[in-house]
Amino acid sequence: MTVVIGLTGGIASGKSTVSQMFRELSIPVIDADIIAREVVEKGKPAYNKIVEVFGTEVLQEDGELDRPKLGSVVFYNEEKRLQLNKIVHPAVREEMNRQKEMYIKEGMQAVVLDIPLLFESKLTSLVDRVLVVAVKPHTQLERLMKRNNFSEEEATARIQSQMPLEEKVKNADEVINNDGTIMGTKTQLQAILKKWNIID
């Protein structure tokens, strides 16, 4: 039986580090962010719907989607954000499911669905186990400011636009505390995978 793991965390909690560790263990990772980019490529059904709803002003000169522009349109407009999610989420879910089924057919021991908004998008039904990568609030703030060159205000706004990390931790099957070293994180991950009988 393939164990389907949902990997999530808060913004800048170090989820991609853990995602990379899974890959190093030869466990396939299906990345929701990459799929979300692919499903809105020029000419795809979701792309056509976005242009229909938001108009050509969210396009670059070459006709591809101008993601930052679309992002700023929906960031401050709840109604438009919901409209966009209604187009993109089903397309992403469908593609993730397709890839997941492919790995299950291949008889993989485990497959990871790397979904930043696993809880917010109500996608927990796609996975068997939820693994949350967590950090302390001040670590999260510092990392986000450094990584995205955000002011404290901008970083706080981004963090607050997501479900609180402690809420995710409460709903997780297992939690990796990513405040320490890379080695410490790896040790925690290996212990969890042993517990789930995925690695020896």
Swiss-Prot record:
SUPFAM superfamilies cross-referenced by the UniProt entry: P-loop containing nucleoside triphosphate hydrolases
EC number(s) on file: 2.7.1.24
Binding site for ATP: A12, S13, G14, K15, S16, T17
Keyword rRNA processing: no
Alphabetical list of Gene3D superfamilies matching this protein: P-loop containing nucleotide triphosphate hydrolases (3.40.50.300)
Cellular compartments per GO CC: cytoplasm
Similarity annotation: Belongs to the CoaE family.
Subcellular location: Cytoplasm
Organism domain of life: Bacteria
Name of the protein in its database record: Dephospho-CoA kinase
